[in-house]
Amino acid sequence: MKVWIVEDINDETVVAQTATVAYNICRKSILENEDDDEAAGEFLNELAHSYSDSRASFGVEGVIWARAMDVISE
């Protein structure tokens, strides 16, 4: 996965865009692993940590988990 860093946008935009990408990835992973909650959970954990380690980590981990919980509850 490529992470594009854009210098001239604000932190909120980065978080929103990152959360949207994460939401779509989480949704795909959960649907593919719907019979395996542990695998889906591990994927979400790795995804959240990879984003929180990136330069655009302004609260992103929490946003990813919140969006993931939305997917799971659908």
Question: In which residue ranges do the predicted regions lie?
Answer:
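Conserved aromatic
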Residues: 16-20, 34
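Short aromatic-glycine-(Arg/Gly/Cys) micro-motifs in beta-strand/loop hairpins
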Residues: 1-12
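Short, mixed-charge low-complexity intrinsically disordered segments
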Residues: 11, 28-74
